[in-house]
Design a protein with these regions (language model features):
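Conserved ATP-binding module of the ATP-grasp superfamily
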Residues: 128-130, 151-154, 165-202, 227-235, ...
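ATP-dependent carboxylate/phosphate-activation module, predominantly the ATP-grasp catalytic core
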Residues: 194-260, 264, 271, 275, ...
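Short, well-ordered beta-strand elements within core beta-sheets of diverse protein domains
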Residues: 166, 194, 239, 377-383
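Peripheral (often C-terminal) accessory segments that flank ATP-dependent C-N-forming ligase machineries
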Residues: 316-458
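CheY-like receiver
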Residues: 66-70, 143-144, 177-180
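ATP-binding N-terminal substructure of ATP-dependent carboxylate-amine bond-forming enzymes
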Residues: 1-107, 139, 394-411, 415-438, ...
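A conserved helix-loop-beta module that forms one wall/lid of the active-site cleft
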Residues: 95-164
């Protein structure tokens, strides 16, 4: 039996499903977290063979001792993962210290965590990147801006999501940013990039031990997460019904360039919505950033709804067996609509639930830790056509206050982007465009599942 340590299995709240599928596949699933055992969801308790509570996951020594305890009790650890961006460096440090070779090591972290380091590997994959400058002083930043023009985007070189990301449109905003950085984050390295006029398209895939995708999907974020966070706006994004071929090719090329194996990945690309001389034409793919973990929040569930499948199982099967026999069924659009508290919406929650009762798959309050980028009240639904999805967005997000006309116009402008306008992806001729094409799912022989008992440690 293989031993799998899952770091922070209780957050995000849907991650217990990864543990359940691992256990169903006969893995010995060992959780380490800082939530008291009695407060864990019953489903998570049932999905773990044992749980070790630490005082704080931020305390490396405590987590180190927890891993050492599991090794003493169960022997060699085969896998250690959190599937969580926040803990990727911690995961790598633990693997390195305990010689767990099934995932990234500490030496791998710069290229997958630092946005400036990612660009080299994107270029190796033959994919265009935005020009950038490592933030130094006013003169250095202004020299870069003289080349690319305003606006520019600044963010931590090693950051999570859109946290502390800002669009600067003039010299005064630049000076304000530099002053705030000097006062609050003098030791944090920031990257400045030219602004890309685009929507975000993602490549979401489960990659096997040979670096081949066994499942592929993608989402579209027509609204900038940076703007959603900074403007306290509603949130929309959706799983696209069919993954565009240029996104697929770009995703596979990046998998190869970064040397990804045995992971669930979420790669983000800009799809340009207008021509930009420095990067290319409308519809072209431009690199944004790699995330060596599943897309955040409830997106794995949305992918399940959009593909009539179970990505938690596909991932667990990849870990346990190297492949999966989980089928992929009918494809749908799966939109996420996140309402922001404090807005006056035309349709009440009850009216939305009544009108879309046959379509809605999930309704919930967003955890505070995720609400900045996702809103406060979420609705997830499925639709066969884009027109149905657009009407859903118009109904859920329509407001009654004085800004109603402007809000509706902005939403209409976003939805008017329509299906991604694709361009043929041209890669460098000395680099193959991707790994060998695969079907959406790789078959494996049926394996017997070993039943295991549940143990807990408070």
């Amino acid at each position: 039996m293989q031993n799998f340590i899952f770091i922070s299995p209780n957050f995000p709240t849907n991650y217990w499903q990864f543990c359940r599928e691992l256990k169903n596949d006969g893995m010995n699933v060992l959780g380490i977290g800082d939530q008291p055992y009695d407060e864990l969801k019953p489903e998570l308790k049932d999905s773990l063979n044992e749980y070790y509570k630490v005082g704080s996951l931020e305390n490396y020594d405590e987590v180190y001792r927890a891993v050492a305890f599991f090794i003493f009790k169960y022997g060699r650890i085969d896998w250690l993962e959190s599937n969580n961006e926040y803990w990727l460096e911690r995961d790598a440090a633990l693997r390195t210290d305990f010689h767990i070779t099934s995932g990234f090591q500490t030496e791998d972290m710069p290229r997958i965590k630092y946005k400036s380091k990612m660009k080299e590997y994107y270029r190796k994959a033959g994919i265009a990147t935005a020009r950038y400058h490592m933030v130094d002083d006013l003169n250095g930043c202004k020299a870069f801006i003289k080349q690319v023009g305003y606006p520019v985007v600044v963010k931590p070189d090693n950051g999570v999501g859109a946290s502390d990301t800002h669009k600067l449109s003039n010299d005064e905003e630049l000076k304000t940013f530099l002053a705030c950085k000097a006062e609050n984050h003098p030791d944090v390295s920031y990257i400045m990039e030219e602004f890309v006029r685009a929507e975000v398209n993602s490549y979401d895939a489960i990659i096997d031990a040979s670096g081949n995708p066994i499942f592929e999907a993608g989402n579209v974020s027509p609204m900038s997460i940076m703007d959603i966070v900074n403007d306290n706006d509603n949130s929309i994004y959706y799983i696209i019904k069919d993954l565009p071929e240029d996104t697929r090719a770009a995703g596979r090329a990046v998998v190869k360039s970064f040397g990804v194996k045995s992971r669930f990945v979420h790669f983000e690309f800009f799809r340009m919505t207008e021509n930009q001389a420095s990067m290319g034409e409308k519809g072209q793919i431009v690199a944004l950033e790699v995330n060596m973990r599943p897309c955040g929040g409830f997106t794995p569930d949305m992918i399940n709804f959009a593909r009539s499948t179970n990505v938690y199982k596909i991932w667990a099967d990849m870990i346990a067996f190297g492949g999966t026999d989980m089928p992929v069924g009918e494809h749908y659009y799966c939109p996420f609509a996140g309402r922001r508290d404090g807005k006056n919406f035309v349709y009440s929650h009850e009216q939305i639930m009544q009108k879309y009762q046959k379509n809605i798959k999930m309704v919930d309050r967003i955890p505070d830790a995720l609400s900045g980028a996702m809103g406060n009240q979420m609705y997830v639904a499925t639709f066969s056509t884009r027109e149905e999805m657009e009407q859903f967005y118009s109904d859920v997000l329509a407001v009654t206050d004085g800004d109603a006309a402007a809000a509706q116009a902005a939403l209409s402008q976003v939805l008017a982007l329509g299906e991604p306008t694709t361009k043929a992806l041209t890669l460098k001729p000395n680099l193959s465009p991707a790994v060998k094409p695969t079907t959406a799912v790789t078959k494996i022989p049926t394996r017997a599942v070993t039943k295991t008992s549940r143990k807990g440690r408070k």
